[in-house]
Amino acid sequence: MDGIKYAVFTEKSIRLLGNNQYTSNVESGSTRAEIKHWIELFFGVKVIAMNSHRLPVPGKGRRMGPLMGHRMHYRRMIITLQPGYSIPPLIEKRT
């Protein structure tokens, strides 16, 4: 589960849980096929649809001595499961 970072709990994502849709942030370099494979393999569920978008806020700049770097950019995935399947709640990232 290297590509999946953490579950997202917002008003919209909690509302989508009623439609059997789960929201999580993933690494921007991960493909849809990889994410689908990881979720089906790890949780034992069937994925029927996946929607994704890049978060509008770019990675925050961070200085490391004379070099300027940036934090990782993330992509948000909304994963729709077949009826009858569910994912146990993932651990929420503390900020």
Curated annotation (Swiss-Prot):
PROSITE patterns in alphabetical order: RIBOSOMAL_L23
GO MF, one annotated term: structural constituent of ribosome
Alphabetically ordered keywords of this record: Chloroplast, Plastid, Ribonucleoprotein, Ribosomal protein, RNA-binding, rRNA-binding
Bilayer-crossing regions: none
Matching Pfam families: Ribosomal_L23
SUPFAM superfamilies, per database record: Ribosomal proteins S24e, L23 and L15e
Disulfide bonding pattern of the chain: none
Major localisation: plastid
A cellular component term, taken from the record's GO annotations: cytosolic large ribosomal subunit
Stretches of the chain forming a coiled coil according to its record: none
Quaternary data: Part of the 50S ribosomal subunit.
Protein name, per record: Large ribosomal subunit protein uL23cz/uL23cy
Source organism: Amborella trichopoda
Gene field: rpl23-A
